[in-house]
Curated annotation (Swiss-Prot):
Major localization class: cytoplasm
UniProt keyword terms in alphabetical order: Cytoplasm, Elongation factor, Protein biosynthesis
InterPro entries: EF-Ts_dimer_sf (IPR036402), Transl_elong_EFTs/EF1B (IPR001816), Transl_elong_EFTs/EF1B_dimer (IPR014039), Transl_elong_Ts_CS (IPR018101), UBA-like_sf (IPR009060)
Protein's UniProt name: Elongation factor Ts
Entry's Gene Ontology molecular function annotations: translation elongation factor activity
A single Gene Ontology CC term: cytoplasm
Record-stated family: Belongs to the EF-Ts family.
Organism: Chlorobium limicola (strain DSM 245 / NBRC 103803 / 6330)
Length: 288
């Protein structure tokens, strides 16, 4: 058996990030050949990934990356098994590398990102393979649960990540004054994270869904013995409350509960003589 030096073990650890004992064993199994040892560890990572495939990856983080000009942004949820790993530099660094890769290549889905190749820091592996390698390195199953990409050539993209990186949001505004709209977009991203809207405005709520809700509210009111002449008023009131909960522009603004988000948008239009609308938003909460 070839003599394995401490320097070789250290070099392999620096390249792969795997523990010293595993690096030593890999070199021993590979007769001291560094490239074969790297391949050995990658295969071991893939085997461990297969072994842990049935494990549940419920911890992790929500990671976001924006372009410098705020014309593009990506948000993703990367899962692992324990909070200990989720808070570690290796995991958070890997999540950051994935967001950068997704943004640079305009990857719009997990499948598109998994097919891309990472840089030298991750052995130029495809993300799909790198996930298995990271499983071997961290000893936990990793899962790229979801991803969204916003491109705003005629607007601005902003984000908000709650401390702890378990909740994040991405917002796209369509506006002819993108430089002035940065703060507004940031505020709306915070609104989305805090208030969890489902749609941007009333028109986005399907009419058939509203009719179903209306009938449910009607039957509830009748079941409670409400007089027929008051039922429609009760139903309308409950629908308004529903809109205020799920429609972004109908929600009370988190920075001033006396006004709605729609008022904030109107104020921006008047102040800057500008057009602005919420083009899209995404809210990710870990484990949802």
């Amino acid at each position: 058996m070839s003599q394995i030096s401490a320097k070789d073990v250290k070099d392999l650890r620096d390249i792969t990030g795997v523990g010293m004992m595993d690096c030593k064993k890999a070199l021993e199994e590979s007769a001291g050949d560094m490239q074969k040892a790297i391949e050995y560890l990658r295969k071991k990572g893939a085997a461990l990934a297969a072994k842990r495939a049935e494990k549940e990856a419920r911890e992790g983080m929500v990671a976001i990356r924006l372009s410098e000009d705020r014309k593009a942004g990506v948000i993703l949820e990367l899962n692992c098994e324990t909070d200990f790993v989720a808070r570690g530099a290796v995991f958070t660094g890997f999540a950051g590398a994935l967001t950068s890769l997704a943004l640079d290549n305009a990857a719009a889905s997990p499948e598109e990102l998994l097919a891309l190749s990472l840089g030298e820091e991750y052995g130029n592996e495809k993300v799909d393979d790198a996930m298995k390698t990271m499983t071997g390195r961290l000893g936990e199953k990793l899962e790229l649960k979801r991803l969204a990409l916003f491109l705003a050539p005629d607007g601005v993209v902003e984000s908000y990540v709650h401390p702890g990186a378990q909740l994040g949001s991405l917002v796209q505004l369509a506006t002819d004054k993108p430089e002035e709209a940065g703060v507004l977009a940031r505020d709306i991203a915070m609104q989305v994270a805090a208030a969890s809207p489902i749609v941007a405005d009333r028109s986005a709520v399907p009419a058939d869904y509203i009719e179903k809700e209306r009938e449910i509210y009607r039957q509830q009111a009748l079941g409670q013995g409400k007089p027929e002449q008051f039922v429609e008023k009760i139903v309308t009131g409950r629908l308004e409350k529903y809109y205020q909960e799920v429609v972004l522009t109908e929600q009370s603004f988190i920075k001033d509960g006396n006004i709605k988000v729609s008022d904030v948008l109107s104020d921006f239009r008047k102040k800057h003589q500008a057009q602005v609308d919420v083009k899209g938003f995404v809210r990710y909460q870990l484990g949802e």
